[in-house]
Amino acid sequence: MKFRHQKTVFLFGSQEEYKILKTWTEKSQKSRLNLNGWYHDKDILIDPVHLINKFNKMIEDEIVDHFVIDSSQIDSNLFNASINWAESRGARIHLIQRKPSSLKFKLGKKNKFGPFMAVSLRREPLARRYNQFQKKLFDHILSTIILLSIYWWFYPLVGILIKLSGRGPIVIHQGRIGIDGIHFKCMKFRTMVFEKPPMDGITYLTDKNDNRVTWIGKVLRKTNLDELPQFINVLMGNMSVVGPRPHMVNEDTDIADKIKRYRIRRFVKPGITGLAAIKGYRGGTNNLKLMQKRIDYDIKYIEEWSLWLDIKIAIITFWKMITFNTDAY
């Protein structure tokens, strides 16, 4: 089992680089890195397809957090194959260069990765601690305000209505995928007829005309108030106020097999609302084109994050709620 504090690293590089990184991870108490794989120079020069297949077999059930490539030894074919493979698994990619590379790719900014200077493949503002602090402060302030001003009196009121609509709990806890692929329990007001979990463990998507939705559930869903308990998730550290919406476990696996770079959305905490949500791409869907648009907006949010963007999304979400224009069902 991979704990939150552990980060798994795989390296495409020389034996010298492997020794340097291994020594650093063993000696540095702050690294929180587990160097779990390595391919040396000769391996890198073999057929890319063979190498990726070999790599897949080796770590079939492994979660990869960081994928380090010595870009001075890699051609464009292997580079493309490597990044497609790594990003499909939700890994961050870092390029280390021992000598000038002939590769012509648009890359991110230089940063320190362990003992190396590296170039990240994607712009990721929330990788900076100051930005993480800003986002966490915004999350905690807004969540505390919502819980103290609204949730404390809204819960017993809506709880009575939920109980009158049928048997079952007031708040349900659903398994969802969070940051770095960590599973967590997402809280929501119950909006559907209470059923025992299916024997196959699969949770089915809700559609617009789903007869399982109760009368009070329709109101809660239309106004997004069913997600009010998720502000507790924010204070618990599972979620953020703004971010990609959390997907169900079985849904996550299915989408990852169909949409490239889907798991990049794991780079940040899932949110109560998000850029994709305010653009109208929300709710369950089996339409791959709509899902692709949602993922595109999620990645755009990750790469262009700013505190102002979070504030803007929160304001737009609130406006959509009070004007009953949430696109929810």
Question: Which residues does each predicted region cover?
Answer:
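N-terminal hydrophobic signal-anchor/signal peptide
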Residues: 1-151
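A hydrophobic, helix-centered structural microdomain
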Residues: 130-195, 233, 307-329
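C-terminal terminal-structure detector
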Residues: 259-329
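A short, structured surface patch at a secondary-structure boundary
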Residues: 206-269, 313-317, 321
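Short, glycine-rich, amphipathic interfacial segments at transmembrane boundaries or analogous
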Residues: 100-110, 171-212, 273-294
